[in-house]
Amino acid sequence: MNMAWFREYLDAHQPDGAWSLQADWAVRTCIRLHAQTGEDAYKAHVIAWADSLVAADACCPECGKALFFALAQTGEDKYRDAIETMMARLGRTPSEATLPAETLYAELPFRMAYEMQLGKMEKVGPCAGKFRQSFHALWDEERGLISGGRYQSAVALLALADAIDLCADQLYEHWRAMVDVYRVVLRGLLAAEAPENPETAGMLLTALHAGVRMRLIDPERYLPVAAKRIAALRSAGFAHAADMLDAEGGAL
């Protein structure tokens, strides 16, 4: 499919040090496309985002994916320093309070990346436990969704997929705790009938594709479901979102 529009989007939306949902998705997509194609333009865009955040002193846990990528690609201390500063602000051990879905997405994948790459895996258990504790506190059994509905459930599902992807499955107990929650939330979202919108569908399908790639779910069962939902997005006029999700699924 035609992804030229995405390269045009990157040219028109240069990093400005102000993190947003749009920046999050652009960086996420660039990291994936760089892994698939090796194209330097995608790597350069992510590193430019990391540089803009460091320069503006605007680093936040949800932009951790850009900083960890830049650190892995360059080894430069400025990215490590920014990551360490954010972790110091958060505190190494997650709060005992129940975290809403948006905070799960912002904070826990960052914490997991830190533990796996810089923190010697010392706090992997509390990170995985926070997902489990927040899930039990937020889960609406009657609706089969996270409290707040489909959007909140999709946010939590993508946070889980990101954290599972970062956690080594050798740490089986903690890895499995997150996988079990992921599967419950995914089933709930797929069972919830509602009109698609690009934000919720994008998070759901990105998390579903990640589950297939990580072998958490059966591709023969779930990829056809994803294809139907992508087609529904395209029919509803969200062609660019459908293109991105098609490219993501086609790489599996």
Where do the protein language model's features map onto the residues?
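Buried hydrophobic core positions in alpha-solenoid tandem helical repeats
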Residues: 30, 53, 90, 134-135, ...
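Asp-box/WD-like beta-propeller blade repeats and closely related beta-sheet repeat scaffolds
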Residues: 77-109
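Loop-centered beta-sheet repeat module
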Residues: 120-161
